[in-house]
């Protein structure tokens, strides 16, 4: 009865009254009339203070005015339009750039990354233009030009890149594809590399706890990747890539319009690397050999008259990696001491869909349904350690949106269900389990766009292993003056720690694994619970007549329980429940400045204080730099006859990082307490020949920084000191690449 009461509470506001509303979309004008959204565009009724701004997809909703039918639409860098509105029918409007000449056309100043001055959540929007600044082969490589996300290699063998936000690794981040959780469970370690960069239309990065609509698991933040839409993507898109390390990649998109309302697309991705590189002469491959085939068939149904939008996605992935010693032959050396080697063979099937409905008679009401079914199977071994996992997952979410009296008072409510079946083999033991959760949520938003808004959410979940629990989330925004936004947030997160799949890199070592069983529900351990608190201030201003903005962020995560991964014994790893305190403090200041026409500069400084009580005392988290400096410069020539040059450069400096203790190793395998500082420079030049064709040439780590001896005891891989997890910088050195992009509209 208690569960039923709480769930029914989430639906109390469903029956409401509202005044007539105007819904619509604002897009960037283009020759093909593509629906390229303008997030943050302002709309206001002429001679009134009633207005709103567009969401990230360009959509808006605002009450009809009794005193004016003239709607003023404006956006920085675009002409301001005033249109007449005589009914509540959904409208679409394309804004023109402010400068448009016959022979010379300046790029419209839609920033490749942007933050809203009016949203309560601290969200950064990353467009596809930002992803083109580097060779964004997959989602794990999409953050090289973004200071909010840290990208590091997890070990010296698999070549896997791991991301961090607010000082915490990716398991504490909710990573979603079109707001459906996609990198979780068995895909946590390598899932980012399973989303090709060309498939991504835009990314939204949310710092802090996020929304209750998306579940209870996020702790440090949320990353959502929006995929290309068959209705708006090019009919044909080809991206070919080749690198000096002999990595090859090909991406192709085929989109076609089946009928007036239906479009479909086939997206193909393949990459391969079969060469052997050992630049540091330690007898191990500097990067793995690999092959990946990735296919997606995407269907879109859009009927604006009926207010219906539907997506259906069918995906298949086959990914294979081989790493280890140069002389390793999997046919003869697998799981033997002949030569140390590793193979990771992953196959993944996925079907997902979204259904959206907007009531044409009551346009402030909408219903959304999200569903996903996936099967992920990984067979792998690392030296003598065998690890296999099969994860079948079902996800569903139903969301109802409406308002209370007017669009200043918005609500979201709904229910979701998650099912996870894990069949896991590690350390010669089967670890099988089933997780089921059912929950309801309610979220209220108050929008007084000029000065203040807030979002308060609450969800209740019942879980077969984690029990019953409530998750609160809260965000507010206050703008004391023009072009300013002060934000504050807090929220609670709870999750199951998948200790093996999230720490697969530790299998590439000779460490002995131990779980200090506390009779918890998962691996004998308790669920992880944390509170996240944060404040942020964004201020826009003019400097020497040029636009600029500065952002200050401070966030703190306090763990009430954490599954501690203790590496302080160099020949062992222990997993146990937190005894004491664990926290992560993150401070960041970021400045964006248009130094002169078509030249944008982004700089950032970040400070981390991440500490945990281990069995040996309170220590900072290994391989987490306290200080980081970031700079990105972008220059574009003027667009003339659809042709231009683009230049991008990104500099990263990482301060010293603590190594976990190696004092238990023989003296020749002991490391210093701290790493050296690391500085890397990436650059790319793009030549746009026309709207259809462009080529690019770039380099990563062009200063050729290399970590010496990244593998401990590489000469004795089956000895007690062998470990590949002390990586703090590049291993391969400099790498250069070239590629081309071809589009057919």
Regions found by a protein language model. Give the residues of each.
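N-terminal periplasmic accessory domains that precede
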Residues: 88-94, 139-142, 161-164, 176, ...
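C-terminal beta-signal and adjacent terminal beta-strands/loops
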Residues: 494, 560, 653-662, 686-745
